[in-house]
Each structure stands twice: as structure tokens, then as C-alpha cells.
Amino acid sequence: MNWAFLQGLLSGVNKYSTVLSRIWLSVVFIFRVLVYVVAAEEVWDDEQKDFVCNTKQPGCPNVCYDEFFPVSHVRLWALQLILVTCPSLLVVMHVAYREERERKHHLKHGPNAPSLYDNLSKKRGGLWWTYLLSLIFKAAVDAGFLYIFHRLYKDYDMPRVVACSVEPCPHTVDCYISRPTEKKVFTYFMVTTAAICILLNLSEVFYLVGKRCMEIFGPRHRRPRCRECLPDTCPPYVLSQGGHPEDGNSVLMKAGSAPVDAGGYP
């Protein structure tokens, strides 16, 4: 994947995104992906090599490392970023499907044929639901991975020394983690950015649902008032004083030219 493809992909997503979604994309690809590629992999590059225990028992450092780091931070973050960005691809695919269907429709019925969609640039119908579900899925993925990190690493902590008593270690041994402070800082940074992304996704969900409710139940969809229902002109025919039907406009002309006896009308 090159940067030109990534730019085209982001422009396709931004075409149908709100301001909150554009902020989310910036946070993901600047504060999460770039930090992960540039810095995080370098920090965790020596995680097992420099995991040292004060014992010479063969296999003890390996089992202790697996006990305290069952899954590497870097691999969990990579899986998290992949799952978080997949829903945006689904939105792009749905948009491409709509545009291709519209193109085939005009090729079959002519350029003057009515469009299948009212406005391709608006989120309506199935595209609205795809977009909304993608937001919920992204928030759920980030929340799920935050819970996994919390369960695997208590309070996202990175201690300097851990005590290990797993077999085949002969007794409780102390194991030392390399660069614990630096790893803790990056862990807190990734957790904070994930929490910000969850907040942005949920805010956009409430915004979209609230906007749709306003469109459905808003003032413009209420029934018109009785004053607006009344016609602007008189009915075409009214009864004259003699009981014969007479044009309403002629009655108005008579009313303007001579006084009309109000007592003759019921």
C-alpha cells in the first residue's frame, strides 16, 4: 500500500464524513498509525531479548516472559488498528456500489432517466445505516481492546521488576523489563488516543441519530395550520340573494361597487 492509494482512500471516506469523522481519521492516522510505525515498534523491539531474570535455569526467562506478556503490545495494537480501519473500507465499498449501480442504470435507460438515488452525495437509506453501524463497530473494537489490555496488564502498568515462580524456575525469581518507563508512556499514549476515538465515534452516532430524528419529527414535517389550509380566493360559486348560483368574483365586484345588505345572507 503506497501513500497515493491511502490518500485516495481517505478522500473517498471524507466525501461522506462529518467533521467529527475527519477528526477521527486524523487522530487514527497521525497519532496512532504513525506513532506505531515510527516509535512503538522500536521501543518494543528488544522486549524479549532484554527480559532478564536472576537465574540460570534453562527456559525460566522464556516462561516468565510468556507469563507476564502473553501477547505483545505491538501485535495487539496492530490487530486493533486493522479492525478499526476496516469499517471505513466498507463505507467506501458501499459508496462505490451505489455509484456503479447508478452508472449502469443511466447506460441502460439513457442519461435523462431518473436517478436511482435522490442525491449520491448524501447519506441516505442503506448508506446511512452502513455508516452508522461502522461507527458503532469502531467504538466497540476500541473499547474491547482497552478491556483486553486492562485484563492482560493491570491498569496498563509496566513495572520495572516482576516476581516469577512458574515452572521450571527453581524458586521465585526476579525478572527485569527493559525501558519500562518509555513503554509505559507509549502505552498510556495509545490508550488515551483510543479513548478519544471512542468519544468521537459515540459523539458522531448521537449527532447522526439526532439529526435524523429532527428531519423526521422536525417542524417542517408537521401538519400545516388551519390558516394555511384556507384558500386565498372565494369559492367559485356562491348563492345570490335569490338562491341562484353566482360566480364569486362577480359577488366581489358587486360588493365593491354597491353596498351589500348583510341581512339577506344567513
Curated annotation (Swiss-Prot):
Keyword Transferase in record: no
Cysteine pairs forming cystine bridges in this chain are C53-C175, C60-C169, C64-C164
Q: Which residues lie on this side of the membrane: Cytoplasmic?
A: 14-20, 95-130, 206-266
Q: Which residues cross the membrane?
A: 21-40, 74-94, 131-151, 185-205
State one molecular function term (GO). gap junction channel activity
Superkingdom of the source?
Eukaryota
Ranges in the topological domain labelled Extracellular:
41-73, 152-184
Localization of this protein: Cell membrane; Cell junction, Gap junction
Intramembrane residue stretches from the record:
2-13
Q: Which UniProt keywords apply?
A: Cell junction, Cell membrane, Disease variant, Disulfide bond, Gap junction, Membrane, Palmoplantar keratoderma, Transmembrane, Transmembrane helix
Topology of the protein relative to the lipid bilayer: Multi-pass membrane protein
Pfam families assigned to the protein according to its UniProt record, in alphabetical order: Connexin
KW Transmembrane (keyword) present = yes
- Give the main localization category: membrane
Name a biological process GO annotation.
Answer: olfactory behavior
Instruction: Give the UniProt entry's GO cellular component terms.
Output: cell junction; connexin complex; nucleolus; nucleoplasm; plasma membrane
Q: How does it assemble?
A: A hemichannel or connexon is composed of a hexamer of connexins. A functional gap junction is formed by the apposition of two hemichannels. Forms heteromeric channels with GJB2.
Task of the protein: Structural component of gap junctions. Gap junctions are dodecameric channels that connect the cytoplasm of adjoining cells. They are formed by the docking of two hexameric hemichannels, one from each cell membrane. Small molecules and ions diffuse from one cell to a neighboring cell via the central pore.
**Family classification:** Belongs to the connexin family. Beta-type (group I) subfamily.
According to the entry, the disease involved is: Erythrokeratodermia variabilis et progressiva 2: A form of erythrokeratodermia variabilis et progressiva, a genodermatosis characterized by the coexistence of two independent skin lesions: transient erythema and hyperkeratosis that is usually localized but occasionally occurs in its generalized form. Clinical presentation varies significantly within a family and from one family to another. Palmoplantar keratoderma is present in around 50% of cases.
User: What is the protein name given in its UniProt record?
Assistant: Gap junction beta-4 protein
Native organism is Homo sapiens (Human)
Question: What lineage, starting at the top, does this entry show?
Answer: Eukaryota, Metazoa, Chordata, Craniata, Vertebrata
